[in-house]
Each structure stands twice: as C-alpha cells, then as structure tokens.
Swiss-Prot record:
Superkingdom of the source species: Eukaryota
Role description: Guanylate cyclase involved in the production of the second messenger cGMP. May be involved in sensitivity to quinine by regulating egl-4 activity through the production of cGMP. Promotes the calcium flux to the cytoplasm in ASJ sensory neurons upon removal of a nitric oxide (NO) stimulus and is thereby involved in the behavioral avoidance response to NO-producing organisms like P.aeruginosa.
Topological relation to the membrane, as annotated: Single-pass type I membrane protein
Cross-referenced Pfam families: Guanylate_cyc (PF00211), PK_Tyr_Ser-Thr (PF07714)
Protein's cellular compartments: Cell membrane
Protein name: Receptor-type guanylate cyclase gcy-27
Every Guanylate cyclase domain range: 538-668
Keyword Lyase: yes
Class in the EC hierarchy, top level: lyase
Length: 735
C-alpha cells in the first residue's frame, strides 16, 4: 500500500537532481551513459595520434581517457542525489584518481597531456549537455507522470471543504412547485431550479456530494491511485466535473464531490407531466448521454457504474451532464473491506426505483430480507448499456420502468426478486409508434448476456432512425421546431393559431435568455449574425456599494433575495429604453445602448435617462429586514466605438469588445457612491442638448488612461417636477 502524499512529501520531485530512491537505477544509467562512448572515441583518437610520435605507458594512456573533474563532479552529484547509493561509484572514481596521479608521474611530455586534456573537456561538455537533455526528457515522460499521480490531486483536503445545510429546503421546494403551477410553460422552463438540502463549497466552487461514514483508515493501492488520477483528468461537455474525494482525516467521513448542476435531473423532467418532453428534448438528451458515455468508455476509467436518470443532470443551458461516474467500484471495495458505512442520516440513499434499474449481474448481492439497499453496485461497460436502456425507456414512456407492471407507487423488494429470479423486464406495449425501433434497442440492452447487448454506435443509429427530423444541439432543434410549427400551423384554422403563438413564444424566450432579440431572430431565420464594429455606442456599469457589508450581515438566502429584487427593478428600467443588459457579475450590472440596434445617436441619452432612474430607485430603496440600510450605487458610462458579436456555437453569447468598455468600467470604479460619472466627450454630447445638468468634477487619474477630465450627471432639467412628485430624496451632488 502506498500513501501517495507521504511519498511525495518525502521525495519532492523537480528537475535534475530530485528523484527518490525508486528512480536511482534509471538515473545512474542515464548519467553514466556518455562515459563508454567517451572512452571509445578518445581512445581511438589518442592511440592513433600517439602511435606516430609518442609511446605512452599504459597508465599514461588510461589517464588521458579520464577526466578527473568531470568524474568527480558526477560522483559527488550522484552522492547528493542517491545518498546511500554513492558506494556504487565512489570506489571506481577513487581508483581512477589514483591511476591518474601515477600516470602523470610516469609521463614524459606533460604539454601533450594538457592539450589532450583540454580537447577531452570540450568533448565532455557536449556529451554532458546531451546527457542532461536525455535525463530531463526521461523525467518528464517517464517519472513526471508517476509523480503527478503521487500528488493525489483528486484528494480534497478538509480545510478546503465546507458543507452548507439548507434548513429551508422543504419550504423552497413547496414554493418552487407553486411557482411552476402558477406560471405558463415557457416561464416554468426558464425559471426551474433544483432545491438542495445541502451542498458543499470547495473554495469558491459549489459541489454536490455523497458522504459516507469512515470507520478506519483507507489504504490507497497503486491501482486505485492510477484510477483516481485518471478520473480527475476527465473533461467533457457532457460530464459533470469530478472534484475529488475527501477521506483519511479527523472528520471520519469519506465524501465524493462533483460539480453542482442547477436546473434539474432527467428523472424529474421525465416524471413531470407538466413538462412537454417532445422528440426535440428526447433526442438531444439521448445524444448527450451517449456522447458522455462514449467518452467514459474510451477513457482509462472505462465505465460509469451508477448510471440512472437521477444522475443525468440538466444544466442552465439545457445541456445534459452525467454525474457520479467511475466511483462505484472504489466505494464497493471500501464497503467490502468495512472501511466505510452509510451514515445514520444521509441526503443520498439508493431507492428501489433506482436499484431495479441496475443490471442484474451487479445486483445479485442484494439482501433478500427486503431491507432498503444502502450500498452501491459495481459497474462495467456492459452494465452501463443496460442502464442506458432503462433511461431511454423512462424518457419514452414518461414513467418508472416497472411502474406499468406493478400498481405500487414505487418499486419494492418483491419486484427485485422477480427481476433476479424470473428475468422480468419493463412492459412494452404493442402499439406501433415511431419510437418502436428505439424500444427494440432498449430490449436488447436488457439482454441477460452482457456480451450480446448493443454498442453505443448501435444506439446512436437507432436514435437517428427514430428521430430523423431532430438533429444538432437543443438550440438548433428549437429553431427548426419553431419553423416546422410555423409551416404547419399557418395552414390550419384560426383555432390553432394560439398553439403557434405559444410555440414561438417558448422558443424565443429560451433564446432571449442568452441573446439580444434581434440576434435571436436572425438565428431563428437561419442567418448567422456576423461580428461587426459600431462607430458609436454607450456602455454603462452600475455597482452596488458596500455589498460586502450585506454579505457579512445577512445569510445567503437574504443576499440572493436582495440581488434578485434590486436587479429586477433595474431590468424594469432597461425595458423602458432602447438598451440591452449585457450581464450581471456579482454586484455589478452592465448595460449597453446602440448595439446591436443602432439608434441614430440616441444611445447616450438613453443611458443617461437609465442612470438617473436607477439612482432614483436606489435612493428610495429600503431593505425589508433592515429599514436603516441605505442602498448606494455608483454609476459610470462612456460613449465611443465598440465591436460586438456572438461568441460560441453550443452556448452562444453576445459579447462587447473595445476600449469603450474599459473606459466605462473605469468611470464606474473611480466614481464616489450615489454619483453618475462620465467622460468629457460624453458630457459634451449631453450638454449640447441643454437638457441635462452636469457638474465638472475635474481631473481624475484613471488607470490605463492617465489624467482624465470627468463630469457628474445630476439631473434631467425637464423632469424636476416629476422627481419631486415621486418623493425621491434629493442628494447634494454639487458640493
């Protein structure tokens, strides 16, 4: 057994001269490899040259073939590297030094000897540099990889791990269900989120976890070390990142962590009858599963082991990601060794509904007493194919695989025995549908002979046949779906026009979450919007001041509620103007006007009006649980040339580039609270209309710009009466 961290700390690795005792043989061979080459070359050269003019005693010739400085350097270097191994080369070097002294005393021409010695040193320098290059290459390719494994990058230290318990999870779940009922389908899709009873923080990353009670120290074998290292290296668009495992510390727990995915699980969507899972969603999710699984099977990890609709997670961009892959055999080994047990209370338990979906060859260990299973099953490639058939069946039938056979709400122990003893399989009706081809493949997946189950490529071909009209990712399919609905529904009677409007609205709302309306419209029409430059546009940044104070005073739930509330009011302001919200990052809010829709120079006035309204909102805003809290914002904007375009294919985003963005950000960051700061060139555009009141702040040092003349925007002169009637608190801006 190897404790990788202890090994690595004891034998810190680096470049030349830092290997441990395991690598001394390889190092010794590499370091001394040039010596015989050197001996042969110099011997031939020396003997040929000496035969014409000189005759040297044997000891003198041997002296010429040695380089005392280089050999001593090699000796002491290897002594430093190898420690106790130095005796292997110390005595040859000592003998070489004695022979050198004897041969020097017998030599008759020291001038020639010194000349030969000089030439040998030049040759040795070249050979030595070459040997070092070979040495370092061997370190990088042979030893470096093993060293990185011994670092145990997959191990999560307890100091980096924090478990967050959501005490209001049940209440939040109830509100989520009520919101889904109250909202229309499009809104329910975009706002749907999972509710977590608890989650983990690893630094700043949120993670889902499964935690076991650790009874005794877990020894990591060489095979486990290699496997976990390879597991940590896996990266794919359809895999939820494996963050690592926390174990062998004073917490007495073993915790497996992977990336937290927010929108929902595939199981939730399949069993939710209010969610319209048509062939667009089915084909996209099925392809995502096969892509992730194929990557796993071709990787050194080679299997998933716990594949179920509950471990297929849908992220915020409607991309399916597979989680909890590759850990089942490691967990089972530790269960068998009695290193771990399930905790008394756990957020993650394996229900019968999941257990009956696992391959029979892996659940034979099930306890027939009827006790709820509390352990994982082992995994294999063929077992994963069995589970894929269960997932596809659930997506097609929108029901638990055995729910149509047993009238019970959820499967139980009796069903388990029927599966194991009587080869029971999920019920497939005789009704002819376009999905019959895929259902036949599902039956092949459930073959009791693992070697006769279909391959991933067979399943991919079945999906292509079954859903021939659904190709590409989910966004492409939604666009084509909308066009298809439009072509079909336009020929129907007026009674069907409502369905068309609903389908269009659903598609466009999903697209408008990620892109401006005009860009989404172009994509809908099959036009790829090119990146372009704009001669003039205005960018505004709004930042909430003293946000760190709120973070310290309020629990996370109230902080998120506060941000949702204030940014929702800001969004309302944006909708009243010709502008586009680019993004929100933490407490910072970014808006642009003049892109992608050019508005004939009105962009600077649109942003000026928005900034005044946003500041007015902040002055009148009160925190629900803290009436004394005064919201303060700082606002900065700047007008100038800008470049914009859609970045990304799978997950497109509309991004802005150019010095104008940086300048606007500097205007905000150098602005005092409750002020609206702009540059001189932007201020002159506002002053030219005689509609706005501005105050010259003066010269301000701006990072990257030097000394800049800045102005504060105070008010829109013709809106004085409206501001007073709204009860907005005035602020001494001109002081």
């Amino acid at each position: 057994m190897i404790d990788g961290e202890a090994y690595f700390e004891k034998n810190s690795t680096g470049k030349l001269g830092s290997w441990g005792w395991r690598d001394v043989n390889l190092q010794f061979i590499i370091c001394t490899l040039p010596v015989p080459i050197y001996f042969v070359v110099v011997a031939i050269w020396t003997i040929n040259g000496a035969s014409n003019s000189y005759r040297f005693p044997f000891l003198q010739t041997y002296m010429i073939l040695t380089d005392r400085f280089w050999l001593f350097f090699r000796c002491f270097t290897i002594v430093a590297w190898c420690g106790w191994c130095s005796n292997y080369i110390f005595f040859p070097c000592l003998m070489n030094a004695i022979l050198y002294i004897i041969s020097l005393s017998l030599s008759r021409d020291t001038t020639f000897i010194l000349f030969i010695f000089y030439q040998m040193n030049k040759l040795i320098t070249v050979i030595r540099d070459f040997s070092y290059s070979v040495y370092n290459w061997c370190y990088e390719t042979v030893i470096g990889e093993n060293t990185r494994k011994y670092k145990m990058t997959w191990k999560v230290p307890k100091e980096s791990l924090k478990i967050i318990v959501n005490k209001n999870a049940d209440a939040r779940m109830q509100r989520e269900l009520e919101n889904r009922t109250a909202k229309d389908e499009a809104n329910a899709l975009t706002s749907r989120r999972r509710v977590f009873g608890s989650y983990a923080l690893i630094g700043t990353q949120r993670a889902e976890f499964i935690q076991f009670r650790q009874i005794k120290h877990i020894d990591i074998t060489n095979a486990s070390l290699d496997f976990l290292y390879n597991l940590k290296q896996l990266k794919h668009d359809n895999l939820a990142n494996f963050y690592g495992i926390q174990l062998n510390d004073d917490l007495n727990t073993m915790t497996i962590l992977h990336a937290l995915v927010e929108r929902g699980t595939l199981e939730e969507f399949c069993l939710d009858r209010d969610f319209g899972m048509d062939e667009t969603f089915k084909s996209a999710f099925m392809r995502d599963i096969l892509k992730g699984l194929q990557y796993l099977h071709l990787s050194p990890v080679a299997y998933h082991g716990h594949l179920h609709a509950a471990t297929c997670l849908i992220d915020i961009n409607w991309v399916l990601k597979i989680a909890l892959y590759g850990v089942t055999n490691f967990v089972c080994d530790n269960f068998d060794a009695e290193n771990i047990t399930m905790p008394d209370r756990s957020d993650y338990t394996i229900s019968y509904a999941q257990y009956v979906c696992f391959p029979p060859e892996h659940i034979r260990e099930y306890d027939a007493t009827g006790k709820l299973p509390t352990r994982f099953v082992r995994g294999s490639k063929q077992g994963d194919i069995y589970c894929v058939g269960m997932i596809f069946y659930m997506m097609i039938e929108r029901e638990d695989p055995y729910r149509l056979i047993h009238s019970v709400e959820r499967p139980g122990s009796g069903l388990m025995m029927e599966i194991l003893d009587h080869n029971l399989m999920p019920f497939i009706s005789n009704n002819e549908t376009q999905e019959d081809t895929l259902l036949d493949k599902c039956k092949e997946c459930w073959n009791r002979d693992p070697e006769k189950r279909p391959t991933i490529e067979n399943l991919r071909n079945a999906i292509a046949i079954c859903y021939a009209d659904s190709k590409g990712n989910l966004i492409d399919q939604m666009i084509r779906m909308n066009e298809k609905y439009a072509d079909e529904l336009e020929t129907l009677v007026a009674a069907r026009s409502a369905d068309l409007a609903l389908a269009q609205m659903q598609t466009m709302r999903l697209l408008n979450e990620m892109l401006p309306a005009s860009i989404a419209k172009d994509l809908k029409n099959g036009v790829i919007a090119p990146a372009r430059s704009y001669a003039s546009a205005t960018v505004m940044f709004v930042q909430i001041c003293d946000f760190i104070v709120i973070l310290k005073r309020r629990p996370p739930k109230e902080v998120i509620g506060f941000l949702n509330d204030i940014f929702d009011q800001f969004d309302t302001v944006i909708k009243r103007h010709d502008a586009y919200k680019v993004e929100t990052t933490g407490e910072t809010y970014m808006v642009a006007s003049g892109v992608p829709n050019e508005n004939e120079g009105r962009h600077v006035f649109e942003v000026a009006e928005m900034s005044l309204e946003i500041r007015a909102i902040s002055l009148s805003y009160t925190l629900e649980n803290d009436k004394n809290y005064k919201l303060r914002v700082r606002i900065g904007f700047h007008a100038g040339p800008i470049a914009a375009g859609v970045i990304g294919i799978k997950n497109p985003r509309y991004c802005l580039f150019g010095d104008t963005v940086n300048f606007a950000s500097r205007m905000q960051s150098n602005c005092p609270p409750l002020q609206i700061q702009t540059s001189e060139i932007t201020a002159r555009m506002l002053l030219a209309t005689h509609e706005y009141k501005l105050v010259k702040r003066g010269i301000v040092h701006v990072k990257g710009k030097g000394e800049v003349n800045c102005y504060w925007l105070n008010e829109h002169i013709h809106k004085d009466e409206e501001i007073e009637e709204s009860g907005t608190i005035s602020h001494p801006l001109e002081s």
